[in-house]
């Protein structure tokens, strides 16, 4: 899912077919990424963020919980080391921002994380952004 906010495009999760989805929808630039949780179908497209660093002029800001960051660093270790690039754009540049369930701001917009569960115990985040609520892979939404 991508939201066109006042200060740019905010992507939620990077599925393995991210590149095809962005091309199909004619999305030319992603200004930031929120992650709901660390399952493969939500993170395995992170490598496709590599082109956006050129257009932005800086690393792509990513917002996630510590467990998601850990999985991203394991799965895409080359993006988080001081490895020399073999050619321009060969390694995505990511700026990690740790979040919790406290509200925060991205691209000039308030984001309210919502604690959800994927099954009985696996924690995921949903997000309330303006009048939109994005809740994925959940079996229950709390009253508050």
Regions found by a protein language model. Give the residues of each.
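Binuclear metal-dependent hydrolase catalytic cores
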Residues: 1-135, 139-143
């Amino acid at each position: 899912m991508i939201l066109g906010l006042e200060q740019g495009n905010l992507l939620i999760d990077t599925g393995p077919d991210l590149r095809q989805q962005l091309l199909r929808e004619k999305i030319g630039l992603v200004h930031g990424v929120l992650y709901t949780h660390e399952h493969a179908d939500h993170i395995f497209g992170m490598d496709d963020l590599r082109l956006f660093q050129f257009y932005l002029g800086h690393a792509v800001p990513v917002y996630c919980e510590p467990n998601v960051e850990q999985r991203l660093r394991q799965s895409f270790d080359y993006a988080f080391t001081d490895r020399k690039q073999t050619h321009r754009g060969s390694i995505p540049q990511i700026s990690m921002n740790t979040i919790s369930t406290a509200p925060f701001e991205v691209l000039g917009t308030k984001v309210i994380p919502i604690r959800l569960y994927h099954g009985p115990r696996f924690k995921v985040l949903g997000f309330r952004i303006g009048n939109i609520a994005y809740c994925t892979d959940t079996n229950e939404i709390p009253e508050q």
